[in-house]
Amino acid sequence: MKLCVALDLSTKEECLQLAKELKNLDIWLKVGLRAYLRDGFKFIEELKKVDDFKIFLDLKFHDIPNTMADACEEVSKLGVDMINIHASAGKIAIQEVMTRLSKFSKRPLVLAVSALTSFDEENFFSIYRQKIEEAVINFSKISYENGLDGMVCSVFESKKIKEHTSSNFLTLTPGIRPFGETNDDQKRVANLAMARENLSDYIVVGRPIYKNENPRAVCEKILNKIHRKNISENDIEQNYEVIQQKEWDMCNHFEEWIKTRPDKEHALKEFYAKCGIKY
């Protein structure tokens, strides 16, 4: 699992300063529509000069097939490492994009946007007349069958997408709140344990990092958890929401429950199993 830091700050200077603070970390940077329109294509060059960051250019192209292919071709010339398009543009648009990018010796990864994480079921249904999960699976199959590299989706759809396509079909999951932060404008959010359990390949974290007084320390903490194969007893409190999400009703509070266990080691194994983590 890779960490992608969203550069969604108010000014280019703030974004570059954050990038400098995060030098030499094993991370990706996400450049969104706001930053790209404000700072232009040269902003990508400036970020690459700070460090050899992998760049995800998050512009979510959605237009007629030829226009989408033109746009994807142009941004691919910038040397970005990942771009995205809307799956709802259809298979012809997807095919044209991938045909156009096939001429590059090293093209960026191309992911499809399924359902924005700002959608809840009610709002999504009012537009698409489908449940989110049904639409996401349909979009994923179309994207996979027509040569895309993966999907942008919520954590809650990641594992199901792989089940209906391939374990190698990438999933990038926004809306990650690593330490239980507020949802802000996201509806379908999750924590690190959920992302791991649902096989996310990339997680996008923005505000919990750049709004912190020490962004680098937050990134290091996240990376430490990503690279840790198993969780320790110190992670129990931070993963309590996973227990709640699994509707584990052995007691009102996990801390109270584990105190009642004569064999703490066995209790921890049960905890790992409920979180979907190999002990």
UniProtKB/Swiss-Prot annotation:
EC nos: 4.1.1.23
Entry's Gene Ontology molecular function annotations: orotidine-5'-phosphate decarboxylase activity
GO annotations of cellular component type: cytosol
Uppermost EC category: lyase
Binding of substrate, residues: 8, 30, 58-67, 117, 177, 186, 206-207
Location of the active site: K60
Reactions that this protein is recorded to catalyse: orotidine 5'-phosphate + H(+) = UMP + CO2
Keywords, in A-Z order: Decarboxylase, Lyase, Pyrimidine biosynthesis
GO process terms (BP): 'de novo' pyrimidine nucleobase biosynthetic process; 'de novo' UMP biosynthetic process
Alphabetical list of SUPFAM superfamilies matching this protein: Ribulose-phoshate binding barrel (SSF51366)
Family matches, as CDD domains: OMP_decarboxylase_like
Pathway this chain belongs to: Pyrimidine metabolism; UMP biosynthesis via de novo pathway; UMP from orotate: step 2/2
Family per record: Belongs to the OMP decarboxylase family. Type 1 subfamily.
Subunit structure: Homodimer.
Function: Catalyzes the decarboxylation of orotidine 5'-monophosphate (OMP) to uridine 5'-monophosphate (UMP).
The name this protein goes by in its record: Orotidine 5'-phosphate decarboxylase
